[in-house]
Amino acid sequence: MAEQEYEIGEDPSLLIVDDDEPFLRRLARAMEKRGFQPEMAETVAAGKAIASARPPAYAVVDLRLEDGTGLDVVETLREKRPDAKIVVLTGYGAIATAVAAVKVGATDYLSKPADANDVTAALLSNGEALPPPPENPMSADRVRWEHIQRVYEQCDRNVSETARRLNMHRRTLQRILAKRSPR
């Protein structure tokens, strides 16, 4: 597949925050070949420190890190540099997490594994082009699961409150969550 040409702009600074070191190094090398100047961090604390000290024009942040959530890095960067283009990566692709990422300031959201071409396209897109419609739309069961997950996250993972909001018994919700939870 041919690489697309994108215009990086005057500031090619890029912060990559991911606790998967081999992926982090591979992505940094690939982004450097594309003209970015990557700076790497493996923790929320390190990512926030870089975002505060030297706010980059671009950022790629993993959602779940060992010491917390990447959304904290997104918030810090958005405060320090409102025009930054931020892409959130996650191995746990769900509508609820995508919505949360965009609400705190991410410009795009990609599920892992995402290659450097996908990341570059997301960072440099102008946001006007709509993504193509899915080839296989979600089933009704999947839509239900996504809705339950979204409400569960809104309730800070409180099962009793989530069950109340969804008008279902707490034990029913616990069974659903246990049955579908990633192992």
Curated annotation (Swiss-Prot):
Q: Which Gene3D superfamilies match?
A: 3.40.50.2300, Homeodomain-like
- What keywords is this UniProt entry annotated with? Activator, DNA-binding, Phosphoprotein, Transcription, Transcription regulation, Two-component regulatory system
Q: Which residues carry this modification: 4-aspartylphosphate?
A: 62
Q: How is it modified after translation?
A: Phosphorylated by RegB.
Quick one: a GO biological-process term for this protein? phosphorelay signal transduction system
Q: Where is the Response regulatory domain?
A: 13-127
**Keyword Phosphoprotein assigned:** yes
Entry-linked SUPFAM superfamilies: CheY-like
Claim: Amino-acid biosynthesis is one of the keywords in the record? no
Q: Which domain of life is it from?
A: Bacteria
Please list the GO terms describing molecular function.
sequence-specific DNA binding
Q: What does this protein do?
A: Member of the two-component regulatory system RegB/RegA. Involved in transactivating anaerobic expression of the photosynthetic apparatus. It is a transcriptional regulator that is responsible for activating expression of the puf, puh, and puc operons in response to a decrease in oxygen tension.
This protein is called Photosynthetic apparatus regulatory protein RegA
